[in-house]
Amino acid sequence: LAPKAILYTQGQVFHIDALLKRQEFQISTSEPHCTVLKNEGGPNAAFLLDFGMEFAGGIRLAVETCTGEATPVLRLRFGESVGEAMSDVGQNGSSNDHSPRDFEVKTTSFSDLEFGQTGFRFVRIDLLSPKTSVRLKAVTGVFTYRNIEYKGSFRCSDPLLNTIYDVAAYTCHLNMQHMLWDGKPFACRRGIPGKNLCSSCFLHCLRVPGVIT
């Protein structure tokens, strides 16, 4: 999945719009369209991506070159909301329970690596290494999607009700990526059964003869 929008930048971040363009992941020695993160005093370079929808999975980073530190440290923060992606662990209820959503990773030149296994829509990336720059070719979402046959459907004359039904069905589907009702790993996996209950109750209440088949 390609990011849909850049919501925030901090420090020295150049050519950030390059991350919104679809590119091949094959990395060459002279990529013409890269986003550059540079730390040379002042706030660390950082940005916040919006993928436009919530999904289960992680992100894939394609790095062209790094200068300064050979294996720069990046901080990744995943969130179902902007507030969560911008929060530290312990702030506003954010946590790393069950599946880390806030952690540090190392990268290197000419690398193509995947990180994260959680539920999110937004991700913030910070360059932590001082006196270092990183040229990012691409950041994409890696969608973990179990192929499940939908047994029912619902459509009516109210577009809003149709949307509510679709969101409820999609929520149930996201929470079935591993064992049945096991849920996508995210900040608080224990909250998953509650989400499933709301979605499944809604679907059950709409089970009107001739409407859901």
Task: Describe each region flagged by the PLM.
Residues 198-209:
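Well-ordered alpha-helical scaffold segments within catalytic/enzyme domains
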Residues 192-198:
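An alpha-helical repeat/solenoid feature that recognizes helix-turn-helix modules
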Residues 1-185, 195, 211-213:
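Extracellular/oxidizing-compartment recognition motifs
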